[in-house]
Every structure is written in structure tokens, then in C-alpha cells.
Curated annotation (Swiss-Prot):
The keyword Isomerase does not apply. It is found in: Cytoplasm. Its main location: cytoplasm. Monomer. One of its GO terms (biological process) is glutamyl-tRNA aminoacylation. Its EC number is 6.1.1.17. It comes from the Bacteria. Pfam families: Anticodon_2, tRNA-synt_1c. Belongs to the class-I aminoacyl-tRNA synthetase family. Glutamate--tRNA ligase type 1 subfamily. It comes from Streptococcus pyogenes serotype M49 (strain NZ131). One of its GO terms (molecular function) is glutamate-tRNA ligase activity. This is Glutamate--tRNA ligase.
Length: 496
């Protein structure tokens, strides 16, 4: 009988939730839910120098926002933070010391740096050289006594089996192996401050919590042989490992960097801009995995049912912000109005645009939104001065028939009564201009759209004109003429 599936996401509270870490959490979540396993959150807070206040809360809040839930965490279980488990780590460090599988090291940082410099100058691969090599028992005792008398606090190092072979069959990469002699020598498992190092603590935690599968990024591959050494030293069975490929920037082809300003890389950014969490969840799930086929829009339940670890990609996952925004637009277009309005409302309120037209404006621009915060620039037309035209828009408005179209349409608007001024009655007026002037297609619609809204593309033109209002639409047409045309006859005709 196979052992129960237990997986974990173990963030460090050192900042906001990055898209890469969110993917690690999400794949562990999908794997657990797909196979009826247990999903665990554990906080790895042993790096006190990088600890950020509220970092843990931020991580958990953003995971919840994405729609993930978990079975065990610091919220429900004691000692699920590494800082609460120091006594347990010390127990196993003492065991390794007693068994001669680890030892206290008194070498200083300055000595380590000098040795590293010597090795590099000699063209050697930097590695720790056991400080006790060649010492007799008496010399070793004297060395330790002198170091302790000088107030030097030791670290604890694991004694590495240099001839050992450390291998595993990776869930993603296949067979991987490392030689013990290529690890860099005996490595520190306990720092001078008494805290364990990552590669020691994570093994104790995973064993204690009975983790069956460790699914993480492939930047952890180099950590795996060190962790296997700890499993070997303590006589424990190691879990299965799966290392997901890197996430790269689709535009540069390089590893996603926090300096890539063309991407939103933190989940907090998506929350603040008003993305739907379901869209972000869907997008992240397809970074390095796909269920096959052409379909790309999946609900959470569908993703759980479809998730297959055997389809995790061996090639880097390309992060494409345009693809993310396309997917977000798909979700917003098909979401119910109440959901989208709730996302847009805070932005409208902050901008002082929560007027009687607010709901109509959201309804008008809902098909265009990629994120809820876009409702502000999209609705500038209704609350700000007429926008400056682009060169492409100016080129359209320099057409020979533009003045004819605008004069005719302005006259139609002026002739409409307040009672008749409705979206369903505006389109017939445009068609009437077509019939009167013989001008049709883009030559008809584009000048009207640009003159009224200042844009070549947008929502349905009659709805835009209706929400803008008859008087303001007429004003925009007049102002457009004043800006771009210098023909006295044309200006007089528009102003009459």
C-alpha cells in the first residue's frame, strides 16, 4: 500500500508573494487535491536577517486570495514555524555530534575567505577543507581550547561522505545524481547563532511532517544532494522530489528578474490592480504544465481534475504578460456584472467618479477591461478634457470627407430631442448621415468616433455618445474642428 500523499509549501516571510513561489504553492495544492492528499503550509523563518514584518501574513493572505486552502498550517497547528522548532533541530544535531557524523567547526569567516581566495587563485574549485586534518587528538583538543578561549563561537558541520553517490529519480527531470566529492566539502548544518541552516532544517521538518513529495523550483536541485546526505546520516527515508523548470521572461528569454519592468511579478500587484483571482490562478497553473489540447481557460475544479504531474514541462516556462492580460480580459468579459462592478468600484470612488453613470460606464467598458483599474483611463473622456490625438488619429481626421461627415452628424445630434436621445436612436442618425452624404464604412464611423471620444477604437459608438451626453458630444465635435481645421467656412458651419 502506498504511503499517504502529503505535500507542503514552505515560504520564507521575507517579502511579497512572487509569481514563482505562487506557482510552487499552486502545483503542490493541485497535486494534493488531485490525489486526495494533504496540503501543508510551513513557515521557514530561520533566516532572521531577511525576516520582514508581516511577511508571513502577506504570504498567507495572497494564497487565500488566489483561492487556495490548506489542511495544516501555523494557523491550525503548533510548531509549524521553524523558529518554534529549534529544540527539535538541536535534538538531531546533538545526535549527529554524538555519532561522529557531524562536528563543531571553529574556522572564522576571515580564514574561510582567505582559503577561498587562495583556491580561486590556484584555479581550484572553492571548497571547505576540514580544519582538523592532520591533527592528533592532543593538537585538536588544544586548538579547540584556544579557539573557545578567544571567544570564537563554532558552527556545526556535517561530515560528508566524499565517495558517496547521491541520486534520485526526479518527478520532472528524470534520473539525477551527484558525487559527494563535488558538494564543496563538509557543510554547515548549524550557524553560530544556534539556528539550523536551510538544508538541515528542511529535512527534519519534512521527515517530522511525513512529507511524501517535495515539488519545488529547479533552483533547488543543488540543495537536494545535501538534503539526501542528512537523510542518510539520520537513517531516514527521503521523499520523492520534483523540480519544476525556471520561469523565463517571454520577451528576453532570460530568467524572470525583479528588474523586468514589463511584467507584474507579485500577487499583491494583481490584487491592487483589480485582476480576478480566478484568472491569475488559471494563468499560473499553465506556467510549466498543460493538460493537452488547445483550451486555456479552466476553472479551479477543472484544473484539479486535470492535473497530471507527468505533464510538467521539462522546458522553461515563458511568462508572457500579454497572455496574462488576455486571459484576465476573458475572465472579466464573461464574469457577471456585479463581480466586475465590485472590482471597479474602489477605483471609481478614489477618482471621484462614483456618479449616477458609474454602473453604465462599467457596463460599457467591461468587454475591454484587462484589470479593474483600467476603468479610470478608459473613462477619462467623461470626466476630463478631450485627450490629445495621436498621429494616426490626426491622419484619419485630415481626410477629405471628414468635415462633411462631422457637419452632418452635428446637425443630426442638434435636431434630436431630449426624449429621443437614446442609444437605440443614435445609430439611425449615423446611418442617415451615410445616406445623405454617400460616405460609409471607416470614412463614416472613424471620424465620428475620434471627434467624440478621441480614440480610434472603443465600445459601441452609440452607447459612448449617449453616456457622454448630447451637449458634450456636440461640444467635442466643435472643439475638434477648432483644433485641427482652419477653414473659416467649415468652422462657421460647425458653430452655426
Amino acid at each position: 500500500m502506498s504511503k499517504p500523499i502529503r505535500v507542503r509549501y514552505a515560504p520564507s516571510p521575507t517579502g511579497l508573494l512572487h509569481i514563482g513561489n505562487a506557482r510552487t504553492a499552486l502545483f503542490n495544492y493541485l497535486y494534493a487535491r488531485r490525489h486526495g492528499g494533504t496540503f501543508i503550509i510551513r513557515i521557514e523563518d530561520t533566516d532572521r536577517k531577511r525576516h520582514v514584518e508581516d511577511g508571513e501574513r502577506s504570504q498567507l493572505e495572497n494564497l487565500k486570495w488566489l483561492g487556495m486552502d490548506w489542511d495544516e498550517s501555523p494557523e491550525t497547528h503548533e510548531n509549524y514555524r521553524q523558529s518554534e522548532r529549534l529544540a527539535l533541530y538541536q535534538q538531531y544535531i546533538d545526535q549527529l555530534l554524538a555519532e561522529g557524523k557531524a562536528y563543531k567547526s571553529y574556522v572564522t569567516e576571515e580564514e574561510l575567505a582567505a582559503e577561498r581566495e587562495r583556491q580561486e587563485a590556484a584555479g581550484e574549485t572553492p571548497r571547505y577543507i576540514n580544519e582538523f586534518i592532520g591533527m592528533s587528538a592532543d593538537e585538536k583538543a588544544k586548538y579547540i581550547a584556544e579557539r573557545e578561549a578567544a571567544g570564537i563561537v563554532p558552527t556545526v558541520r556535517l561530515a560528508v561522505n566524499e565517495s558517496g553517490i547521491y541520486k534520485w529519480t526526479d518527478m520532472v527531470k528524470g534520473d539525477i545524481e551527484f558525487e559527494g566529492g563535488n558538494i564543496g566539502g563538509d557543510w554547515v548544518i548549524q550557524k553560530k547563532d544556534g539556528y539550523p541552516t536551510y538544508n538541515f532544517a528542511v529535512v527534519v521538518d519534512d521527515h517530522d511532517m511525513q512529507i511524501s513529495h517535495v515539488i519545488r523550483g529547479d533552483d533547488h536541485i543543488a540543495n537536494t544532494p545535501k538534503q539526501l546526505m542528512v537523510y542518510e546520516a539520520l537513517g531516514w527515508e527521503a521523499p520523492e522530489f520534483g523540480h519544476m523548470t525556471l520561469i523565463i521572461n517571454s520577451e528576453t528569454g532570460k530568467k524572470l528578474s525583479k528588474r523586468d519592468t514589463n511584467t507584474l511579478q507579485f500577487i499583491e500587484d494583481y490584487r491592487k490592480k483589480g485582476y480576478m483571482p480566478e484568472a491569475v490562478f488559471n494563468f499560473i497553473a499553465l506556467l510549466g504544465w498543460n493538460p493537452g489540447g488547445e483550451e486555456e481557460i479552466f476553472s479551479r475544479e477543472q484544473l484539479i481534475a486535470l492535473f497530471d504531474e507527468n505533464r510538467l514541462s521539462k522546458s522553461p516556462a515563458a511568462f508572457d504578460q500579454k497572455k496574462m492580460d488576455w486571459m484576465s480580459n476573458e475572465y472579466l468579459k464573461h464574469a457577471d456584472f456585479e463581480t466586475v462592478y465590485a472590482l471597479c468600484k474602489p477605483f471609481l470612488e478614489e477618482a471621484g467618479r462614483l456618479t449616477e453613470k458609474a454602473e453604465k460606464l462599467v457596463e460599457l467598458y467591461k468587454p475591454q477591461l484587462k484589470s479593474a483599474d483600467e476603468i479610470i483611463p478608459l473613462t477619462d473622456l467623461f470626466f476630463s478634457d478631450f485627450p490629445e490625438l495621436t498621429e494616426a488619429e490626426k491622419e484619419v481626421m485630415a481626410g477629405e470627407t471628414v468635415s462633411t461627415v462631422l457637419q452632418a452628424f452635428k446637425a443630426k445630434l442638434e435636431a434630436m430631442s431630449d426624449e429621443d436621445f437614446k442609444p437605440e436612436n443614435i445609430f439611425p442618425q449615423i446611418k442617415a448621415v451615410q445616406k445623405e452624404t454617400g460616405i460609409k464604412g471607416k470614412n463614416l464611423f472613424m471620424p465620428i468616433r475620434i471627434a467624440v471620444s478621441g480614440e480610434m477604437h472603443g465600445p459601441e459608438l452609440p452607447n459612448t455618445i449617449y453616456l457622454l451626453g448630447r451637449d458634450k458630444s456636440i461640444e467635442h465635435i466643435k472643439n475638434h474642428a477648432i483644433r485641427l481645421y482652419r477653414s473659416p467656412l467649415f468652422l462657421n458651419a460647425l458653430r452655426s
